[in-house]
Regions:
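Structural preference for beta-strand elements that scaffold enzyme active sites
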Residues: 155-159, 237-241, 261-263
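Residue-level signal for alpha-helical context at structural boundaries
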Residues: 59, 107-108, 136, 236, ...
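Acidic, metal-coordinating catalytic cores used for nucleic-acid/nucleotide bond scission
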Residues: 240-248, 268-271
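Active-site loop/helix belt of alpha/beta enzymes
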Residues: 239, 247-261
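Dynamic "connector" segments at or just before major functional cores
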Residues: 1-213, 217-232, 255-258
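A short acidic (Asp/Glu
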Residues: 169, 248-254, 273-277
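A conserved hydrophobic secondary-structure block that centers on an alpha-helix together
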Residues: 228-229, 234-242
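An anionic, glycine-rich sequence signature occurring as long contiguous blocks
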Residues: 4-24, 261-304
Length: 304
């Protein structure tokens, strides 16, 4: 389908004598103006510089046209602007704003890398390098909040939660997951909440096969996060929240050894229903009166 182009738009304002005219007929035009803000944020955080330092460039130096940092920036900013497929590189090669995000002159700068170059770059990254990349992202997030809160936090809550990432095709390690009723990956997502703030901050994601158990990779991730968080916030208490898929003596032992407060969901059973009988009746009455879902909290002793 042909693209409909608007060559000119005129804006009339009540309190202005002259109209404002916007024209779109320049050769160096782009639809991704938000990329400039992302570039400014990256300049402040120096994130892509740090990520590039995690990668080893094994290419012949005499044949390099695009540095590792340039390739990384091109891919990251492209993804952030909605260009998931490396095939988009062909039409973005001379986009002025995408060249600007890489650090090139938006008009006279050299064209960006092609799809084959980006594909070779992605496939050359080793598992060890991927670990270093994830660790660098997590440390950048922690350092940002350490600066924001001046290293002072009374309580930090770590939420660990598996989620589905549906797949479409023959990607490696994609499996059918009965709980989500789809073929997918099952990444483990970690977020941080500081003190009584309502915002949850993404700090790490571990990509896993679609049939992974909920706890797969969680122990190592939790230990790494606690190590860095305790160094950044030495006076903080820690709370870990996980759902029922983590319930089990092995995981509870890990939480005890890490000396953290924890909240673990449990699958319903006859004994728990009996213990919660009075509270369930109270919640039912409140819900019937209000017409909304109501939450009632209580405590009990329970040993499986």
């Amino acid at each position: 389908m042909a693209t409909a182009c608007i060559p000119q738009v005129t804006f009339e304002f009540h309190d202005q004598l002259k109209p404002v005219v916007a024209r779109f007929d320049q050769a160096q035009a782009s639809t991704d103006g938000g990329a400039v803000l992302l570039k400014a944020l990256d300049d402040q955080l120096q994130l892509t510089n740090q990520l590039a330092g995690c990668l080893v460039d094994r290419r012949d130096p005499d044949k390099i046209r695009h540095t590792v940092r340039d390739l990384l920036r091109q891919r990251i900013f492209g993804l952030a602007c909605g260009y998931e497929d490396a095939n988009d590189a062909a039409r973005l090669a001379d986009d002025p704003l995408h060249k600007l995000t890489v650090g090139r002159d938006p008009v006279t700068g050299a064209a960006l890398a092609s799809q084959p170059t980006l594909s070779r770059f992605e496939n050359a990254v080793s598992p060890r390098a991927l670990y270093r990349l994830g660790r660098t992202v997590a440390m950048t997030v922690i350092a940002h909040h350490q600066q924001r809160l001046k290293g002072r936090a009374q309580r930090i809550t770590i939420d660990l939660d598996p989620t589905d990432d549906p797949t479409h095709g023959q990607q490696a390690f994609t499996f059918f997951n009965g709980h989500y009723d789809t073929w997918c990956y099952l990444p483990l997502v970690a977020t941080l909440t500081f003190n009584d703030e309502t915002e949850q901050y993404l700090v790490a994601i571990v990509l896993r096969p679609g049939n992974s158990p909920a706890k797969h990779g969680a122990c190592g991730l939790l230990r790494t996060l606690l190590q860095h968080l305790r160094r950044a916030f030495p006076g903080a208490a820690f709370r870990v929240r996980v759902d029922g898929g983590f319930a089990g003596n092995d995981w509870l032992d890990v939480l005890e050894r890490q000396r953290v407060e924890y909240v673990v969901g449990l699958a319903s059973n006859v004994r728990l229903v009996r213990c919660a009988g009075r509270l369930l009746g109270e919640a039912h009455g409140l819900s019937k009166y209000s017409g909304r879902t109501e939450h009632v909290f209580g405590e009990t002793l329970y040993a499986a």
